[in-house]
């Protein structure tokens, strides 16, 4: 296979149906169908609803991606699919489809780690990954710090959330403030008009000497503060609360990420995951990395959220590294550890 393999990637770990096509490090197509509107009235992702949405959206999304890339499915060199972690039912939809296509076409199939794919996607924008680098991955389901020596096989977990992920906290605080689901974008927009110093919300595990995160206490503190204002008959300054909450999240995430770089003598920090689209997280990370002499890499927002291009990018990296394709009977694994980049 060539050094620039043509790879189709399938992503169904949560509520986005993603199909991407890459040629080596070149992005050819990245099509996404989101079921977020179906989950909005529940205030969170409903696994059964998400699984059914994937069943309906996967084939049309694949057709759009192939059309955008100007290819037929038979043209691809390999197929990559998210095998985990994620929601068990939604993962099964993507894995089953990928296996069927690979078998029918006689193509090699790579079952890959969702978190490692969030790291690998940066090659599509900024070129080969530095070795080593620290990766901060922040989404609705994950808040993790990783030491990435080689995204195709040597990834070491440094810390993770001990309770709520940052994205989950955004969703719950948005609900408290009467903002729509998912909470990240509306909180970011509201915060533009607010004062980040309006309330000094707590920073969980900020000074505990670990690289773990905790956002449950912050989420609860915001809810209690809002409840007290409402009991007292006072208006809730949504923009100020959003800005103060967002500042607390960005403060902890960036402080620990920079500390991890210093501790391990690493000069490059990569930030990925859906929350990486947050404007304050990006700006504060840039400020702190510049002050610490650390090079910062953050993909554009469209590559930070769950998508098929990131899966295809990791597949291309694995092929270039000479990794053997997955066995046909590999399972979807909702709790796949980051140490298993390829199943």
Swiss-Prot record:
Subcellular location(s) of the protein: Cytoplasm
Cofactor: record remark: Binds 1 Fe(2+) ion per subunit.
Cofactor: Fe(2+)
One MF annotation (Gene Ontology) recorded for this entry: N(6)-L-threonylcarbamoyladenine synthase activity
Keyword match S-adenosyl-L-methionine: no
A Gene Ontology term for the protein's cellular component: cytoplasm
Enzyme Commission number: 2.3.1.234
Keywords of the record: Acyltransferase, Cytoplasm, Iron, Metal-binding, Transferase, tRNA processing
Coarse class of the protein's main subcellular location: cytoplasm
Keyword flag Nucleotide-binding: no
Name of one Pfam family that matches: TsaD
Record's catalysed reaction(s): L-threonylcarbamoyladenylate + adenosine(37) in tRNA = N(6)-L-threonylcarbamoyladenosine(37) in tRNA + AMP + H(+)
Similarity comment: Belongs to the KAE1 / TsaD family.
Protein name in the entry: tRNA N6-adenosine threonylcarbamoyltransferase
Organism in which the protein naturally occurs: Acidothermus cellulolyticus (strain ATCC 43068 / DSM 8971 / 11B)
């Amino acid at each position: 296979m060539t050094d620039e393999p043509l790879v189709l990637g399938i992503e169904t770990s949560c509520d986005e149906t993603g199909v991407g096509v890459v040629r080596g490090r070149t992005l050819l197509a990245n099509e996404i169908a989101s079921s977020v509107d179906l989950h909005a009235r529940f205030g969170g992702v409903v696994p059964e609803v998400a699984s059914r949405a994937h069943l309906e959206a996967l084939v049309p999304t694949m057709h759009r991606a192939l059309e955008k890339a100007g290819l037929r499915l038979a043209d691809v060199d390999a197929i990559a699919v998210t095998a985990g972690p994620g929601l068990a039912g939604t993962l099964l939809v993507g894995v089953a489809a990928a296996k069927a296509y690979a078998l029918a076409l006689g193509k090699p199939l790579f079952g890959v780690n969702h978190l490692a794919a969030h790291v690998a996607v940066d090659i599509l924008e900024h070129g080969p990954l530095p070795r080593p680098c620290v990766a901060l991955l922040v989404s609705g389901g994950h808040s993790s710090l990783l030491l990435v020596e080689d995204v195709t096989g040597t990834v070491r977990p440094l810390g993770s959330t001990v309770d709520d992920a940052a994205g989950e906290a955004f969703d719950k605080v948005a609900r408290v403030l009467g903002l729509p689901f998912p909470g990240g974008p509306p909180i970011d927009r509201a915060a533009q008009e607010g004062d980040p110093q309006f309330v000094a919300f707590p920073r969980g595990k900020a000074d505990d000497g670990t690289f773990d995160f905790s956002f449950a206490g912050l989420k609860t503190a915001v809810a209690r503060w809002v409840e007290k204002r409402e009991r007292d008959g006072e208006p809730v300054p949504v923009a100020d609360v959003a800005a103060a909450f967002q500042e607390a999240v960005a403060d902890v995430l960036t402080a620990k990420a920079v500390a991890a770089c210093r501790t391990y003598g690493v000069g490059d920090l990569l930030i990925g995951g859906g929350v990486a689209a947050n404007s304050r997280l990006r700006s504060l990370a840039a400020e702190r990395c510049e002050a610490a002499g650390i090079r910062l890499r953050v993909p554009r927002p469209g590559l930070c959220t769950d998508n098929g291009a990131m899966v295809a990018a990791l597949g291309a990296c694995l092929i270039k590294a000479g990794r053997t394709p997955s066995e046909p009977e590999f399972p979807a694994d909702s709790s796949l550890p980051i140490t298993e980049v390829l199943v």
